[in-house]
Amino acid sequence: MAGELVSFAVNKLWDLLSHEYTLFQGVEDQVAELKSDLNLLKSFLKDADAKKHTSALVRYCVEEIKDIVYDAEDVLETFVQKEKLGTTSGIRKHIKRLTCIVPDRREIALYIGHVSKRITRVIRDMQSFGVQQMIVDDYMHPLRNREREIRRTFPKDNESGFVALEENVKKLVGYFVEEDNYQVVSITGMGGLGKTTLARQVFNHDMVTKKFDKLAWVSVSQDFTLKNVWQNILGDLKPKEEETKEEEKKILEMTEYTLQRELYQLLEMSKSLIVLDDIWKKEDWEVIKPIFPPTKGWKLLLTSRNESIVAPTNTKYFNFKPECLKTDDSWKLFQRIAFPINDASEFEIDEEMEKLGEKMIEHCGGLPLAIKVLGGMLAEKYTSHDWRRLSENIGSHLVGGRTNFNDDNNNSCNYVLSLSFEELPSYLKHCFLYLAHFPEDYEIKVENLSYYWAAEEIFQPRHYDGEIIRDVGDVYIEELVRRNMVISERDVKTSRFETCHLHDMMREVCLLKAKEENFLQITSNPPSTANFQSTVTSRRLVYQYPTTLHVEKDINNPKLRSLVVVTLGSWNMAGSSFTRLELLRVLDLVQAKLKGGKLASCIGKLIHLRYLSLEYAEVTHIPYSLGNLKLLIYLNLHISLSSRSNFVPNVLMGMQELRYLALPSLIERKTKLELSNLVKLETLENFSTKNSSLEDLRGMVRLRTLTIELIEETSLETLAASIGGLKYLEKLEIDDLGSKMRTKEAGIVFDFVHLKRLRLELYMPRLSKEQHFPSHLTTLYLQHCRLEEDPMPILEKLLQLKELELGHKSFSGKKMVCSSCGFPQLQKLSISGLKEWEDWKVEESSMPLLLTLNIFDCRKLKQLPDEHLPSHLTAISLKKCGLEDPIPTLERLVHLKELSLSELCGRIMVCTGGGFPQLHKLDLSELDGLEEWIVEDGSMPRLHTLEIRRCLKLKKLPNGFPQLQNLHLTEVEEWEEGMIVKQGSMPLLHTLYIWHCPKLPGEQHFPSHLTTVFLLGMYVEEDPMRILEKLLHLKNVSLFQSFSGKRMVCSGGGFPQLQKLSIREIEWEEWIVEQGSMPLLHTLYIGVCPNLKELPDGLRFIYSLKNLIVSKRWKKRLSEGGEDYYKVQHIPSVEFDD
């Protein structure tokens, strides 16, 4: 395999010498001789690659060739850049600094001669070791030819890998839907067995999605961080409307304690299914599980190679162990992938190939992953001869008869997976090895990956009939997906592969091969020792999740070509001198905090750089020397918004190779950037007329993605003339922030036939006719358009539209009509800020696939369409509308699961029997006019979560809710005692959350089976413990600003099941805990209670207590030797919190 990678490098060097031949004037003879030597060298490499496994001497020769070729490429490419850029201001001085590498033309001639001699010597050595000369094909066919040759091995759906799993899925779904006895289910078995596939089928099963109102999927991995796992779970469980960048940032900034508290509360109040995929150790589960409350609303599915993850003594736990596929099922799976046909009559399997296939799948040991990879590999081989060769390779490796299902199964499967790598063409080997940069279970952005590949010239778009880098990257990912080596699916809105990742076992192969080839050096915590510096010999270096990186101290490898940081948060860049890294092609400093906010001017010395990313980095000043980087194809300056004022010099016009450019969102107004020369751009983000001229866009005819801010005064004619010729656009966003542009009566006409996503925030009183809209449009967002005519008759004819958002002031009319059969593909409709809209008519069969409807701040809308609101709606949010009583219309929607009503104006709300048959969650917020709510028997039979906020005139809850498990009440000051929870109602209620109620209900009005109670902002005068401690099943209590008295007592025998108690911001002075109170308490948190004189003496009798978190002011008293240490000395963990 190394031979093929070296052959790839040889071809790159050949290309350099051929394409830049005119620059080698004066050394033409030496160049011609070197090219001849390279041709001869290529003819030996294939046989050398085959023999390196059995000969250490041949292996040494291959490694020496790699060094020769890479060194030659570094020197000759620097020479080429010297010739190209030597006359550019600032470059001549820099090139002189490279005299140690490329001094002058005479010495370059001597160097080329030296390289030729080294090649001659290594060829002679290989011949003496028995390596033979062979005729080889070109290393890479043009993309178009390969596309014609590629056999389409997969159907459009992904059922090809779904063999013999139906019964397992059915059984597992039963544990989550029908069985209440099991709260935790694990799927365990060896890698590649299909555990994740099985879990995914359960996670997406219709019965499961109907059962739970919240779902979260988190990949844990071998080297996970607890904080990251909790962040991902919280991100999945948060309500959809909160999924903003601000919310994401808030979650990322949470401490572990805050995350644990948020998740604990969220899981107590919801019916959730959490999947933790790929847990490695029992200890990992032990540190994750504190977020799970003792209540029964949640369920957990684990996958692991370790059967002892959860203690089997837990009666709520069940372990499911799938078996390897039997021979017949193995053959069925293999056949679906290696011979993908819809009709058996279309294709007859060659008898010899069938026998060879049956023989080879024996080595897969019934592992689905190994079978799929083998099938994908053989699907690319067309002849019996190819199949025989692969069969012999497998057989020769597995000596000693290791072919039995149970005989060294892992070794057999690992070799099958390794062989799939060996069978890749050389360009795909490089692509695959690049995936070793990323941590386990990391979602890799395919767009970034494509530009990494292009920057290292793994592919060169100029070879492929004008294809853009993103297109070529998609083709390569598709080939790896087809071979079952990479996991990814095309996004339905963009038709592209947006993210990808590796199966665990394929990642092990990837890391192993990358290590064998010295392809990449991986480190997680950058050491600054000379010992580390001396060990970094790879030409690629990646830091995973660093906290600090000092370039000068941590990196000392002048041959380094790629430096990449992979992180989920910000990190400190202590030093940014790149003077020793002048051969870098790729530099990714995502989310770096640069010292002083300045990018060092020495960045301009990296003249080989093709990829530079400062995405979300904290930097305010970009140096003028950036203009030296003439070879950049990717430049991301979308820096952190915390950098309010950013200086970018006008040096970008010389970067004529740029394909991707993201500018800062905020640039100093005085800065003017000339961009007209960047005609090869494929993506341009954050273009602003404040800093650039619209006319610069005219020549960027290759653009696929364009986002524009119109700030300076402009005209529609200028805009149309500037972007009208960009016919390949797929995504366009135009935001008018003060251009005072006014459109003509006919609206804006864009002839973008490939456009899929369009966002317009500008004045546009008329829409173009539907024939002028791109026919492939899938996503449309309109805002501030002030459309005078109903937009629906035009928009509903966009046959591919899946998401439509009519934002603030997008329509100024009164009536909208959605016609019969209109919007045939629409799945999500959002309407907000339409001040004059008052009438909405929906005809039968309109929007037949609509799932989500959001209407916000449309105060004149009095009612919803009575008859033909799409019946498949599953989620509806209505806020700040003039609707008086939408319930009669909504309760007929038989698939509705989530309903949120906020700031409506009705006085009475009646839910009739049989209505809302599938509703799981109901949120009523700020219904100021609501005085009475009636729920008839049989209404909302599946409702398990009810949230009521600031419904000030509503005095009590209605009867009913037989399945309700979570009740959340906020600001119910006027409710009568006893009306919060009526005795005998809500028999399954286990979580109660009350905020701002001046009086605590009597104990007879609390359901006796409550397990969780949160009291917030109540300031009740009487001791709440007197009532709460009598709730025999209570396991979690949280009191926040909920007691205004001075003394609280927990009586002996009280709180018999309590496990967690949290008390914050209470003015109490004395707390007494009698012996025998809270005998099962394991976690106690006391925060910001400044008047509490001392912790109760009774804590020393709570032997179950494992975790105590208190204010730092208690540290002296509770530490060893302190006066109250005796109260807490038995507690394993005592933390002092701010």
Swiss-Prot record:
Gene3D superfamilies: 1.20.5.4130, Helical domain of apoptotic protease-activating factors (1.10.8.430), P-loop containing nucleotide triphosphate hydrolases (3.40.50.300), Ribonuclease Inhibitor (3.80.10.10), Winged helix-like DNA-binding domain superfamily/Winged helix DNA-binding domain (1.10.10.10). Residues 166-422 form the NB-ARC domain. It comes from the Eukaryota. LRR repeats lie at residues 544-565, 566-581, 582-606, 607-631, 655-680, 681-705, 707-726, 727-752, 754-774, 775-797, 798-825, 847-871, 873-893, 894-918, 940-963, 1028-1050, 1055-1078, 1079-1103, 1115-1138. Keywords: ATP-binding, Leucine-rich repeat, Nucleotide-binding, Plant defense, Repeat. Induction: In cv. Columbia, regulated epigenetically by EDM2 (e.g. alternative polyadenylation (APA) resulting from cooption of epigenetic information at the TE insertion locus COPIA-R7) to accumulate upon Hyaloperonospora arabidopsidis isolate Hiks1 infection. GO terms for biological process: defense response to oomycetes. Disruption phenotype: Compromised RPP7-dependent immunity leading to an increased sporulation of the incompatible Hyaloperonospora arabidopsidis (downy mildew) Hpa-Hiks1 isolate, but normal resistance to Hpa-Cala2 and Hpa-Cand5 isolates in cv. Col-5 background; full susceptibility to these isolates is observed in cv. Wassilewskija background. One of its GO terms (molecular function) is ADP binding. The keyword Nucleotide-binding applies. ATP binds at G189, M190, G191, G192, L193, G194, K195, T196. PANTHER family: DISEASE RESISTANCE PROTEIN RGA3 (PTHR36766:SF40), PLANT BROAD-SPECTRUM MILDEW RESISTANCE PROTEIN RPW8 (PTHR36766). Disease resistance protein required for incompatible interactions with avirulent strains of Hyaloperonospora arabidopsidis (downy mildew), isolate Hpa-Hiks1 in cv. Columbia. The LRR repeats probably act as specificity determinant of pathogen recognition. Belongs to the disease resistance NB-LRR family. This is Protein RECOGNITION OF PERONOSPORA PARASITICA 7. It comes from Arabidopsis thaliana (Mouse-ear cress). The gene is RPP7.
